[in-house]
């Protein structure tokens, strides 16, 4: 598969370089008996910033999962970004999941909004409305509205979003990154049919969240 991003996300390169230099210096001056813990830390940092290619389903009405993680909510809720009632599906990412975000559908971005906020545990419901977050609202060619919200967590303190209003997105396209544990909420039209359940492990792009 042609994936236009390195398998280790660019967002992690500075962290990996720092961890590698520290491990090397401690190994050189103190030996492996002391440095092994720092080599383990380097391995953890490298695996955290991995960003592998994923197969993308071709089903026309499929809404793809925007992130790796575990489903923590499937419910009817108000979408405050598109001002409507919606089907809300939430994905919680722990520190061992891939943390890049990918577009759930093909469409054009009608809105991008950033909100400063708290850093509560991203697995709890109130993180959706109280934590730092960034929302993109996507309009599909069929006139359906899909909202994808990046939410910072207890450890995550940096949301990165690389798209702007008016730009097109294709399903599976990488559009953002959240560092060190977080959550993504997806709001869909009320009539959408969920294909996942609470507690299920999901993968970015390759898991179908719902059908429009």
Swiss-Prot record:
Pfam families: PS_Dcarbxylase (PF02666)
Main location: membrane
Catalytic activity: a 1,2-diacyl-sn-glycero-3-phospho-L-serine + H(+) = a 1,2-diacyl-sn-glycero-3-phosphoethanolamine + CO2
Compartments, as annotated in UniProt: Cell membrane
Annotated site (Cleavage (non-hydrolytic)): 181-182
GO biological process: phosphatidylethanolamine biosynthetic process
Cofactor(s) required for function per UniProt: pyruvate
Binding note for cofactor: Binds 1 pyruvoyl group covalently per subunit.
Keyword line: Cell membrane, Decarboxylase, Lipid biosynthesis, Lipid metabolism, Lyase, Membrane, Phospholipid biosynthesis, Phospholipid metabolism, Pyruvate, Zymogen
GO molecular function: phosphatidylserine decarboxylase activity
Enzyme class: lyase
Enzyme Commission (EC) number: 4.1.1.65
Post-translational modification: Is synthesized initially as an inactive proenzyme. Formation of the active enzyme involves a self-maturation process in which the active site pyruvoyl group is generated from an internal serine residue via an autocatalytic post-translational modification. Two non-identical subunits are generated from the proenzyme in this reaction, and the pyruvate is formed at the N-terminus of the alpha chain, which is derived from the carboxyl end of the proenzyme.
One of the record's GO cellular component terms: plasma membrane
Membrane topology summary: Peripheral membrane protein
Modified sites of kind Pyruvic acid (Ser): 182
Active site: 182
InterPro entries: PS_Dcarbxylase, PSD-A
Family indicated by similarity: Belongs to the phosphatidylserine decarboxylase family. PSD-A subfamily.
Function of the protein: Catalyzes the formation of phosphatidylethanolamine (PtdEtn) from phosphatidylserine (PtdSer).
PANTHER family: ARCHAETIDYLSERINE DECARBOXYLASE PROENZYME-RELATED (PTHR35809:SF1)
Subunit structure: Heterodimer of a large membrane-associated beta subunit and a small pyruvoyl-containing alpha subunit.
HAMAP family xref list: PS_decarb_PSD_A
Protein name in UniProt: Phosphatidylserine decarboxylase proenzyme
């Amino acid at each position: 598969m042609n994936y236009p991003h390195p398998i280790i996300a660019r967002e992690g390169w500075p962290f990996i370089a720092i961890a590698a230099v520290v491990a090397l210096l401690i190994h050189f001056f103190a030996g492996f008996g002391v440095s092994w813990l720092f080599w383990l830390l380097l391995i953890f940092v490298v695996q955290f910033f991995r960003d592998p290619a994923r197969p993308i389903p071709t089903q026309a009405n499929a809404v793809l999962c925007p992130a790796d993680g575990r489903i923590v909510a499937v419910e009817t809720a108000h979408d405050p970004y598109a001002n409507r009632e919606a089907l809300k599906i939430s994905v919680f990412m722990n520190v061992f999941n891939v943390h890049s975000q990918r577009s759930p559908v093909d469409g054009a971005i009608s809105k991008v909004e950033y909100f400063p906020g708290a850093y509560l545990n991203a697995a709890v419901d109130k993180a959706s409305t109280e934590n730092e977050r960034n929302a993109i609202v996507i309009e599909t060619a069929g006139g359906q509205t899909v909202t994808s919200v990046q939410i910072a967590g207890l450890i995550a303190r940096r949301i990165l979003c690389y798209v702007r209003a008016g730009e097109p997105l294709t399903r599976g396209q990488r559009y953002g990154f959240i560092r060190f544990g977080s959550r993504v909420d997806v709001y869909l039209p009320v009539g959408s049919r969920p294909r996942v359940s609470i507690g299920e492990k999901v993968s970015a792009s390759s898991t179908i969240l719902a059908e429009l």
